[in-house]
Amino acid sequence: MFDILIHGGTIIDGSGVTRFKSDLGIKGDKIATIGDLKNQQAKRIINATGLIVSPGFIDAHAHHDGVLLTDPQHASGLRQGVTTEILGQDGLSYAPLSKENYKMQRQYLSGILGLPPENLDMSSVKAFRANYHKKVSINTAYPVSHGALRMEAVGFHDIPLTGKTLEHAKSLLSEGMEQGAVGLATGMSYHPNAWSTTEELIELCKVVAKAGGVYITHLRDVNPDRGYGGGGIPEAIEIGKRSGVKVHFSHTRTSAENAGKIDEVLELVDQGKKDGVDCTLELYPYPTGSTFLLSSLPSWVHEGGPDKIIEKLKDKTTRTKIIDALALNTKRPLHDCVLSHLPNNPQFEGMTIPEIAEIKNKSIGDLALDMLIEENLQVGFWLSPPTNIAAWRQVSKDCMEFLSRPDYMIGSDSIPLGSTPHPRAYGTFPRFVGRLRRQFDVMSLEQVIQRAADNPAQRFGISKRGRIQEGYYADIVIFDEDRIIDTATYDDPKQFPVGIPYVLVNGSVSVDQEICTGIFSGYAVP
């Protein structure tokens, strides 16, 4: 007898091959049998007639490290069909960190990760993974946080890793890889990551390469103080060449400013591949992104960590210098920022900085810094979408063209904090699998599922997931290919998709007729 029998569905197995009609039997946390099972018994039978049965989606880039620890149900991801997430992105995470450094990092990252419990053990990758294993609704994978390594080696300071400090970081990284990390994640536009040198990264990536892991990088592309040229791509390629590590580029896509220029975006990556660097990429299917307001401050302000930052924000002379620097930041202009997460001022969530500044009779620079002080740095924002509908449509089409490449995968870059988060937190996967697939008809549904499931599983070494196959874990999403669609918008972002009635995680029904069941069956993987 099976624990669960999925009857009458059409299976898309994730490998890219043509769909086929079949039943599927589950025992425990694994797929036991695929075939004609109409005469078989099961404790639970799910009628999937007229529906697609596919592997659960794997979110290749999510910022849920903190949120999952305060909201383990994680409906915003689960209702999209996401069964596994790669955490630790952009080097912005919590392990390995001592108690004191975790406390500091917890506050520093509160605008992007929220505030997880203060008493957690984050001293190693093993300890980090234990905080999630069978305690949250989805599976989690973790690349070692570059920011955490730097904090443990030299504190929150603009100091290069050399000699003993570099060896200490390499030792922590090696231990993390042995404890199940899938690689090393850096955010070269964020701190303390941005203070690293290319040589430091090459040495760290030699450790990752030896362990078979992946170098996951958000490039040095939006930090005006530490730019590299070429959007940071040449640095990542150089690291791949000299260390032998596999390179994964985070959210690589066009925007309203360069819509349609796909070849221009990928030229340096493709040249790196020709030169022998193993590269993959990922994106989210929206024209603008979101992050935490603290990250927009100039590099020197971050020196010393959160308490020192707040001191600088309050000092009149230093404050003026910061505001002058913010006025020059064209990558994240304050006038385009919609504040999405303000725990102490929720009445202003969903409003732009200029709108709030007008209400408070302040300049936009003063308003931004005052909000950081009032919120103890816990401020999130997203950039306003383009008003040019043609540019928006072109960016959406570009996303599908990018994703038609076999080296691409999908990652939400989700930050589900506040009352008005970026809509990608609730809509990324049904937008890709449903809305944009139907609108642009660039890929078959089989190819779409491969990008959403098997590609990230293969890239990050997540074994026995990403496909519907006997002996694989029963991470499964059942959906209507004609109805699946996102409903989250910039104006009304906390809206769940439709057309996804069932989601299973490790053989447990986690979404049942579009309702989350409250089962925490997620594993720390691989």
Please give the residue ranges for each predicted region.
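Hydrophobic, small-residue-rich alpha-helical packing segments that form membrane-like cores
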Residues: 90-99, 111-242
